[in-house]
Amino acid sequence: MPKEEVLEFPGIVTELLPNATFRVKLENEHEIIAHTAGRMRKNRIRVLAGDKVLVEMTPYDLTKGRITYRFK
């Protein structure tokens, strides 16, 4: 199965939601719902409100995403 095209955007976590999901405001002023990637869960990387993150999205649904990196 070929890897599909993904879009990556930096953003800031604005709100923590239930079930390890977050509301993220992207740099282009869009707000999306994102969850943490499996490697971040596995390595127990905490994401809090106000953190700068990198969000990965598919071109099919631009309202949901996956947090792949938390900037230091």
From Swiss-Prot:
Keyword Cytoplasm annotated: yes
What HAMAP family does this protein's entry cite? IF_1
Quaternary context:
Component of the 30S ribosomal translation pre-initiation complex which assembles on the 30S ribosome in the order IF-2 and IF-3, IF-1 and N-formylmethionyl-tRNA(fMet); mRNA recruitment can occur at any time during PIC assembly.
The family note in this entry says:
Belongs to the IF-1 family.
Q: Which Gene3D superfamilies match?
A: Nucleic acid-binding proteins
Write the record's keywords in alphabetical order, separated by commas.
Cytoplasm, Initiation factor, Protein biosynthesis, RNA-binding, rRNA-binding
Please state every residue range assigned to the domain named S1-like: 1-72
- Which InterPro entries does its entry note? NA-bd_OB-fold (IPR012340), RNA-binding_domain_S1_IF1 (IPR006196), TIF_IF1 (IPR004368)
Does the keyword field hold tRNA processing?
Answer: no
Q: What does this protein do?
A: One of the essential components for the initiation of protein synthesis. Stabilizes the binding of IF-2 and IF-3 on the 30S subunit to which N-formylmethionyl-tRNA(fMet) subsequently binds. Helps modulate mRNA selection, yielding the 30S pre-initiation complex (PIC). Upon addition of the 50S ribosomal subunit IF-1, IF-2 and IF-3 are released leaving the mature 70S translation initiation complex.
Which PANTHER family does the protein's record reference?
Answer: TRANSLATION INITIATION FACTOR IF-1, CHLOROPLASTIC (PTHR33370:SF1)
Q: Which GO terms describe its molecular function?
A: ribosome binding; rRNA binding; translation initiation factor activity
Which protein are we looking at?
Translation initiation factor IF-1
